[in-house]
Amino acid sequence: DKNKKPIWMAGFPGFTPIR
């Protein structure tokens, strides 16, 4: 899932950063 990507992916739309 794109929402499971690491926080460095937070810069991309649709991606949720993992805290």
From Swiss-Prot:
GO annotation, cellular component aspect: extracellular region
Subcellular location: Secreted
Main subcellular localisation: secreted
Tissue-specific expression: Expressed by the venom gland.
Keyword Signal tagged: no
Source organism superkingdom: Eukaryota
Keywords: Mast cell degranulation, Secreted, Toxin
GO molecular-function terms, A-Z: toxin activity
Miscellaneous: Negative results: does not provoke rat ileum muscle constriction and does not show algesic effects.
Physiological role: Shows a high potency in mast cell degranulation (is 10-fold more potent than bradykinin).
Family: Belongs to the bradykinin-related peptide family.
Record's protein name: Protopolybiakinin-2
Organism placement in taxonomy: Eukaryota, Metazoa, Ecdysozoa, Arthropoda, Hexapoda
